[in-house]
């Protein structure tokens, strides 16, 4: 019986130690969420300005550009998956990987060949475990995204997109990431990045008003050549920031759940230990009383 008490005591200590770790990780994630939200808010004006500029050029000009023109036939499509570098974040990575699998199934049903670009070690591990190939990978920056990484991804995607499919290029590009809705809610989202669909930033004209006339210097094609890569990079960076904030929120939620479960384990094992101690004391009393009765009857 004493051994059983020691087992319960050890389990209580183990649960308490685990709770200290998960509680610390919960607090760290909470502070990182605030920083991630601040970065999202700080990048929003730049993203809106770039979107308005691209919208103006694409809407008020009649120039066909490779990044905005729909191909006659889509043979190959790229999927960029934004997962995490670390675990202990609940269903954060699994949800975005599941969404990407559903997207891939849809694209394959349309007769398209899939090329994967992976961001985050969890996505890389997922593909390695299933022995599936990927075009390129980026790791080490999911928790604190850097614009240099977004630029690297954007450059690789644009280069792949302008290359003909017959030479290893792609006809369209999709990104899959977790959008940060709130601390309690993060939703996996799919966005078609290329060919460009500029639907933001174009204000509806007032009835009877004359549409603005734009003059572009240099030529419209040159303006698009300069603006569109910047637009792609800003969209990718925004996806990385959304994903980072979602990751911290998911980890905070997972660690809070782990801390609550540790509390429940401590309560359960404490009750079991008390019951075991009570049983041991009762048994000892019974043995003493039995021994006393035996001595009394022998006299």
Swiss-Prot record:
Write out the transmembrane intervals: none
Instruction: Tell me if Cytoplasm is a UniProt keyword of this record.
Output: no
Q: Where in the cell is it found?
A: Cell membrane
GO cellular component terms? plasma membrane; proton-transporting ATP synthase complex
Give GO BP annotations, semicolon-separated: proton motive force-driven plasma membrane ATP synthesis
> Would the keyword Transmembrane helix be found if you checked this record's keyword annotation?
no
Mode of membrane association = Peripheral membrane protein
Q: Name one Pfam family in it.
A: ATP-synt
Q: Which UniProt keywords apply?
A: ATP synthesis, Cell membrane, CF(1), Hydrogen ion transport, Ion transport, Membrane, Transport
Instruction: Tell me one GO molecular function of this protein.
Output: ATP binding
Q: Which SUPFAM superfamilies match?
A: ATP synthase (F1-ATPase), gamma subunit
The text of the family note is: Belongs to the ATPase gamma chain family.
- Quote the subunit structure annotation: F-type ATPases have 2 components, CF(1) - the catalytic core - and CF(0) - the membrane proton channel. CF(1) has five subunits: alpha(3), beta(3), gamma(1), delta(1), epsilon(1). CF(0) has three main subunits: a, b and c.
Q: What does this protein do?
A: Produces ATP from ADP in the presence of a proton gradient across the membrane. The gamma chain is believed to be important in regulating ATPase activity and the flow of protons through the CF(0) complex.
User: By its UniProt entry, which PANTHER family does this protein fall under?
Assistant: ATP SYNTHASE GAMMA CHAIN, ATP SYNTHASE SUBUNIT GAMMA, MITOCHONDRIAL
What's this protein's name?
Answer: ATP synthase gamma chain
């Amino acid at each position: 019986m004493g051994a059983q008490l020691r087992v319960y005591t050890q389990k209580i200590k183990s649960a308490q130690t685990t709770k200290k770790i998960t509680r610390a990780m919960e607090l760290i994630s909470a502070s990182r969420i605030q920083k991630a939200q601040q970065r999202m808010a700080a990048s929003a004006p730049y993203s809106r300005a770039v979107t308005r500029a691209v919208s103006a050029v694409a809407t008020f000009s009649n120039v066909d550009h490779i990044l905005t023109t729909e191909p006659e036939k889509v043979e190959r499509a790229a999927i960029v998956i934004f997962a995490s570098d670390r675990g202990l974040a609940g269903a954060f990575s699994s949800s975005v990987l599941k969404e990407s699998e559903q997207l891939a199934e849809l694209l394959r049903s349309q007769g398209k060949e899939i090329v994967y670009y992976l961001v985050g070690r969890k996505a890389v591990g997922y593909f390695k475990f299933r022995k599936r190939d990927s075009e390129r990978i980026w790791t080490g920056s999911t928790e604190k995204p850097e614009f240099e990484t977004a630029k690297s991804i954007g450059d690789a995607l644009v280069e792949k997109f302008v290359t003909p499919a017959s030479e290893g290029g792609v006809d369209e590009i999709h990104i899959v990431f977790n959008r940060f809705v709130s601390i309690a809610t993060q939703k996996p989202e799919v966005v078609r990045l290329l060919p460009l669909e500029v639907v933001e930033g174009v204000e509806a004209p007032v009835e009877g008003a004359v549409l603005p006339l734009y003059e572009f210097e240099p030529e419209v094609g040159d303006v698009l050549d300069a603006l569109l890569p910047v637009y792609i990079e800003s969209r990718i960076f925004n996806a990385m920031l959304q994903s980072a904030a979602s990751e911290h929120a998911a980890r905070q939620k997972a660690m809070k759940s782990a801390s609550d479960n540790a509390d429940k384990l401590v309560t359960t094992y404490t009750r079991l230990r008390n019951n075991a101690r009570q049983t041991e004391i009762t048994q000892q009393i019974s043995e003493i009383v039995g021994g006393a009765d035996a001595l009394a009857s022998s006299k």
